[in-house]
Amino acid sequence: MATLQDIGVSAGINILSAFVFFIIFAVLRLQPFNDRVYFSKWYLKGLRSSPARGGAFAQRFVNLDFRSYMKFLNWMPEALKMPEPELIDHAGLDSVVYLRIYWLGLKIFTPIAVLAWAVLVPVNWTNNTLEMAKQLRNVTSSDIDKLSVSNIPEYSMRFWTHIVMAYAFTIWTCYVLMKEYETIANMRLQFVASEARRPDQFTVLVRNVPPDADESVSELVEHFFLVNHPDHYLTHQVVCNANKLADLVKKKKKLQNWLDYYQLKYARNNSQRIMVKLGFLGLWGQKVDAIEHYIAEIDKISKEISKEREEVVNDPKAIMPAAFVSFKTRWAAAVCAQTQQTRNPTQWLTEWAPEPRDVFWSNLAIPYVSLTVRRLIMHVAFFFLTFFFIVPIAFVQSLATIEGIVKAAPFLKFIVDDKFMKSVIQGFLPGIALKLFLAFLPSILMIMSKFEGFTSISSLERRAAFRYYIFNLVNVFLASVIAGAAFEQLNSFLNQSANQIPKTIGVAIPMKATFFITYIMVDGWAGVAGEILMLKPLIMFHLKNAFLVKTDKDREEAMDPGSIGFNTGEPRIQLYFLLGLVYAPVTPMLLPFILVFFALAYIVYRHQIINVYNQEYESAAAFWPDVHGRVIAALVISQLLLMGLLGTKHAALAAPFLIALPVLTIGFHHFCKGRYEPAFIRYPLQEAMMKDTLETAREPNLNLKGYLQNAYVHPVFKGDEDDYDIDDKLGKFEDEAIIVPTKRQSRRNTPAPSIISGDDSPSLPFSGKLV
């Protein structure tokens, strides 16, 4: 078990690491050749030019102004200067609300920490229960545990203090959550009301279009919406399966990068042609001329791309039973997106379309009927992933409990002979080991989310974040506590009756605070400080700049600003909320470490959002109900654990008074859900009508159809250098097929005449396009 000395060694290592990271960052950010890495957002907005273009040759690469190095931490106050309204305009509402999660942590835990240290620490410290348990029952403990509830004897009246504090912590947390929910809801409504025109405001995604033997998907979609939304339907774009085409385009881009590299290399030294080997990684195989080889490969794959495009456009099997349908007004889109279209609730399913940059195109090709099966498979896979990950978690706990294991395994005693090494192993290594084990988890969870078939990047990230949160709850928290308790009290477990084991675990739960303190310092202190260095984007930018960049456009594409990473960042924040709320009434020693994390992370990520991150999408803070719900879950878990802990301490008179807390907390959650959540899942028709009215008054001659015409065209049909225009293949729908007649024997309320019946109907234009 980590002692106070071990915690001190870990704190020293992590504080030193964070300080070194900040110094390195301060030096690197001042160098002109790194300007595009550490200020990439300003370059993407076109508001910053490279300082390396002017001045002396040396000044283009190295900052020779030594006065700038004297203020190496001035980026911290600068990150706090930009006011929130300006930050919303600069980075979007998603980024600002994400920052408010850190601010929420500070608002919740600062008063809680002050109250806990003022009231609970003296109550816990003035007892000798652990000393007596150590002598009588051979229970392992440290000086830090004397500040916890474990140090209070059974049947003590002092437990009433912890119950009163639990009520105080709950009331304060719920109050802050309610005020924040109200603020975020108002920010969202105001943001949506003042937001510039976007295609997704007028568009819905229609899925599970029923098959029809007589009509194509495009014709069927048009007929359905002309009949059921006759005054509001504007245009649509059917979805196609272009995944194979997208893979070919991606492969061609890689080949083009290699060709650019070898052409640039040959231009610098044209004394001899460049030769490459065709074998694995260029280590063996036939030698060929590099430039000629890649020109031939690009020509070959270009022909494949053209052929695949023809197949996608002309093959009915490539057309999916889904479409992006656009309307003349936001009001009409809101009505369609938020209502059931037919008596069969499994057909003609409508939802708000993601904004074009948020669409995850490859998943649109997944048949809707297979989504349930896919999600069931992923639920099972996630269960086994979570279950089997308990093994490395138990290994991490063994690193954190050397002293306890030595009691049962004396041959390991040589490990703890050196006090400093023992402090490093127990105070630093467990946190590092756990962080390494979790390194690949976000990628695995994102792959699982993609397999489930979500159609937008934002929904993918929210699902991955939810699974990461559950994983942290089960493995990082619960498994660490249970496995750690078993390791720490191993000798006690082996020499006591079975009915005494729950009591030993109850005493041991607060003792795991030492492990979580070390993890917070590794992940929340040094880890957050290391984020600002951006080592991977920095290295990749300079490699691309050296070998691939030929133009300013190439240099812009070489930048990798990244984003806030909701799927990884938010679950980590929620783990700290969970730890803080669980240990606030149990071991207040942990709270200052959490406060340092929230304060440091708020400053670092505010700087990154202002200067670096380029958000991939804008959901107008649609994720906030998830954030609120997980904090509530952490609060309920903390109450249940405290109730169980007091039960093991035989606080029979005091413990029942905690039963009301989870009930009241869940009731509070339902109140907030009913009061504020509708602003995040539905678009008020009143707001939509107001925005439409204002836009009509300001732009009476707006060509909305032209604005929406190509908004949801698949990216593989856009901006390619090949002389290919999808409208050339589908222009007949615009020019020749002004009216799309039905081909059925009988059809009521058809806005176009039937080919067979010849009934008259008003002419209505068709504007369907292929996505």
Curated annotation (Swiss-Prot):
Pfam families: PHM7_cyt, RSN1_7TM, RSN1_TM. Residues 28-100, 179-374, 446-462, 534-566, 606-625, 671-771 are cytoplasmic. GO terms for biological process: monoatomic cation transport. Its main location: membrane. InterPro entries: Csc1-like, CSC1/OSCA1-like_7TM, CSC1/OSCA1-like_cyt, Csc1/OSCA1-like_N. Residues 1-4, 126-156, 402-419, 486-504, 589, 649-651 are extracellular. Changing A439K: Converts the channel into an osmolarity-sensing phospholipid scramblase. Changing L438K: Converts the channel into a constitutively active phospholipid scramblase. It is a multi-pass membrane protein. It comes from the Eukaryota. Changing K435I: Abolished activation in response to poke. Activated by hyperosmotic shock after mannitol or NaCl treatment. Activated by mechanical pressure: activated in response to membrane stretch and poke. Membrane lipids play a key role in mechanosensation by acting as a wall mainly formed by lipid head groups. Residues 741-771 are annotated as: Disordered. Keywords: Calcium, Ion channel, Ion transport, Membrane, Transmembrane, Transmembrane helix, Transport. Changing W75K: Abolished activation in response to poke without affecting activation in response to stretch. One of its GO terms (cellular component) is plasma membrane. Changing V335W: Abolished homodimerization, leading to formation of a monomer. It is found in: Membrane. The chain crosses the membrane at residues 5-27, 101-125, 157-178, 375-401, 420-445, 463-485, 505-533, 567-588, 590-605, 626-648, 652-670. PANTHER family: CALCIUM PERMEABLE STRESS-GATED CATION CHANNEL 1, PROBABLE MEMBRANE PROTEIN DUF221-RELATED. Belongs to the CSC1 (TC 1.A.17) family. Homodimer. Acts as an osmosensitive calcium-permeable cation channel. Specifically conducts cations including Ca(2+), K(+) and Na(+) in vitro. Inactivation or closure of the channel is calcium-dependent. Mechanosensitive ion channel that converts mechanical stimuli into a flow of ions: activated in response to membrane stretch and poke. This is Hyperosmolality-gated Ca2+ permeable channel 1.2. It comes from Arabidopsis thaliana.
